[in-house]
Amino acid sequence: MKTLLTLLCLAGTLSFAQQNSPQDMKGMNMPGHDMSQMSAQDSGEDADASAHAMHSMEGHHMDMGPHMKMTALRTPQAGDAEKAQQVVEAARGVMEKYKDYHVALNEGFKIFHPEVPQKQYHFTNYRYAMQAAFNFNPEHPTSLLYEKNGDDYRLVGVMYTAPKRFTEDDLNQRIPLSIAQWHEHVNFCAAPTGRKQEMLGPNPKFGLRGSIITHQECDANGGEFHPIIFNWMVHLYPLEKDAAQIWSVDRQHAD
């Protein structure tokens, strides 16, 4: 199930770096997800697990309820708008640079599960993901967000990540929380071996849309509980015309 790690990795990138320990480096396969303790016997289901996790995230954010945590929108403070605009301007430079997705691939971005049909494809740079665990560089987003058009990809946005250990005050230092709302995925019960397909079915117990939200309930059903599976993340759409669309929470939920 380490590929569930690889899949969940995309969104939250860098759980290992936030803990700063060799043990957590096993979680780098999936940005922001540390499932390093999973049994080796799960390895045969890696591809399925990845697809399940991707499916759970794809277009279902609004259904996640207790599986998603959003930062609170703060009262604007002096300098917030200017600071956020600096991030937007840097992101626009990124958009121009990587408009051709081949450039992104040549510079180390990897398509996250290209074999899984998605509304939006994350091209993830794991070196930038590592950097994001320690400092914030808006010119180095963890992921580039592309929409597929035939055999081509159209760049529509970027994704920044931050360690799951960060407080909201820490996140506010990166991008003011009066402007942007970060989110993380929580209360994840991984399905036991042989039952991964259940995460894709109707009324699932397991996964990001599952009914199980507590450690006790997960144990009782043979699953493996993870209080947080991704690092903090925020999507930014810098080519939009106004701040509401650039930092759109609704679009972030839907993507």
Predicted regions and their residues:
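Sec-dependent N-terminal signal peptides
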Residues: 1-19
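Generic alpha-helix initiation/capping and coil-helix boundary signal
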Residues: 4-10, 43, 77, 84
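Histidine-centered metal-binding segments
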Residues: 20-70
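Primary mode marks residue(s) on the alpha4-beta5-alpha5 output face of response regulator receiver
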Residues: 51-144, 148-255
